[in-house]
Amino acid sequence: MAAPNISFASVTLDCPNQEELADFYVALLGWRKERFDEEWLAVISPDSHICLLFQETDDYVPPVWPNEEGKQQQMTHLDFAASPKDKEAVKSHALACGASLASVQYFESSTVFIDPVGHPFCISFFG
């Protein structure tokens, strides 16, 4: 049986404040912000239909990365890509936008950051 046509739409990040986290990703990526309704705020790529959605939760607990036993674990993380020639500029930009550098880095070709509410994300430098 052939699979029905299902396309990727978005990644949703829980957070304590939609506006603040969306503003961080707008600054980081240069994407546009759009409110779908009272509950959903999106940051949308200008190059495709892909978007990040932000959902406020009253009991938000930031994930701990790397994992620590007994602490909130990450459920997923975002991966972005940039040119190796722009590595230092991209890292400086991410930090200026409000990201922090993760305490553990596993690969030379990728840098792990933590967004303002604790979600880890990577920027890989290939090309």
Residue ranges and their predicted role:
Residues M1-A9, L13-R35, S45-S100, I114-G127:
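Glyoxalase I/VOC metalloenzyme domain signal
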Residues W40-A42, S110-V112:
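Short hydrophobic/aromatic beta-strand element in the GNAT-like acyltransferase core
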